[in-house]
Curated annotation (Swiss-Prot):
Record organism: Ureaplasma parvum serovar 3 (strain ATCC 700970)
InterPro entries for this protein: G_ENGA, GTP-bd, GTPase_Der, KH_dom-like, KH_dom-like_a/b, P-loop_NTPase, Small_GTP-bd
Function noted in UniProt: GTPase that plays an essential role in the late steps of ribosome biogenesis.
Binding site for GTP 2: 181-188, 228-232, 293-296
Family: Belongs to the TRAFAC class TrmE-Era-EngA-EngB-Septin-like GTPase superfamily. EngA (Der) GTPase family.
The protein's name in its UniProt record: GTPase Der
Amino acid sequence: MRTIAIVGKPNVGKSSLFNRILMRRKSIVDDQPGVTRDRIYDIGNWLTRSFMLIDTGGIISSKDTYQDNINEQVLFAINEANTIIFLVSAKDGINNDDKKIAKMLKEKAKDKKIILVINKIESEKYYLNEGELYSFGFGKFFKISAEHGIGMGDLLDELVKDMPIQNNLEKQERFKFCIIGRPNVGKSSLTNTILGEQRVIVNAEAGSTRDSIDNDFNYYNKKYTIIDTAGIRRKGKIVESVEKYAVLRTKKAIERSQLILLVLDGSEPFKEQDEVVGGLAYNANIPTIIIVNKWDNIINKNSHTMEMVKKQIRSQFKYLSWAPIVFVSALDNKRIHTIFEAIEFVREQAMRKIATSLLNDVVIKANAFQEPPPFKGGRISISYIVQVQSQIPTFVLKCNNPKFLHFSYARYIENEIRKAFGFDSVPITLYWQDKNKKLRGE
């Protein structure tokens, strides 16, 4: 699959163009320069052609260390790409930063296709010297408005004209999981260690990752997509509109995932905000693995330390009692393999399908062994059970009247199913339904 990178100075509309090509809002757009910090990846499609699209941070000359990191990210993207969109702004005109980028592209991307694109032509007041644009040496250029969609058809035709027809099946086959946690627990360090490269900027500043970033990779011939998300702060600390959108992005990333890695900082006491983020995982009702990061930073460990930490987690995160706990040190690349062992273990459980006859044997026997208590003037009686979904194991239990069900008895039946069929590391869902109400398809 061909790769296209969008580069340019800050605030020329790179993220707006990225979103316009994808036809949805993937990158955060804001008038504040420097909003895009890492490389953002997604698959675009045009005229039955598929391509990988990369949004990058704005390049400027600066002595700031963080800006140096952004510039380095852009160079990574240029190296990965087959085609470069060099974006400038008609509204702001050409300046020295644009000229420096053009020079850099001639040096760093001389063997790649470079397309000069002039954005923001919707502005009533703009002036561009076409002779100056041709002096860049990139030949033909395109005038567009990413915000309003003007000129996009011609640009997209140019981007895909030499591309083979390709579908999106590879993306669909990948097992997708996201990394969540409060700021500064090491989510981006963990992503980088897993990917084996500096794809996400790691910075000691809490909240340095604002976008959710999709990264495709293979691990021992298995295909995965990992989503690194913005750290979720307490509501009182979210003051920027960009930060608010990043929190929404994290929740959307959870919705797109098949599994969650909840990262905790093992080098300090767990905080209330860790529990809040854990609540998002619980509410999502999808498989979750708790990752205790920075394990090597804990001093004076002994043979009992790990078990003590597990007990503390079980106490503070009672609602995730089924979630496996894994201990790693992302910066030192230690015990990372245990994450994938846990992922595959949980994945197998989540996909497990139980025969209806076996389910009924277990549940009917459990119902007979422990008689349900009377509740709301009646006593529940289970007729039969059937599994209606895997991935998140889901069961429908037919009974005489669901209103007679006491929560303690529902928990008893859930535990019996978990124990009998080995669902000890995934969430399961039970729906209690009146036996006279038919399931869809019956």
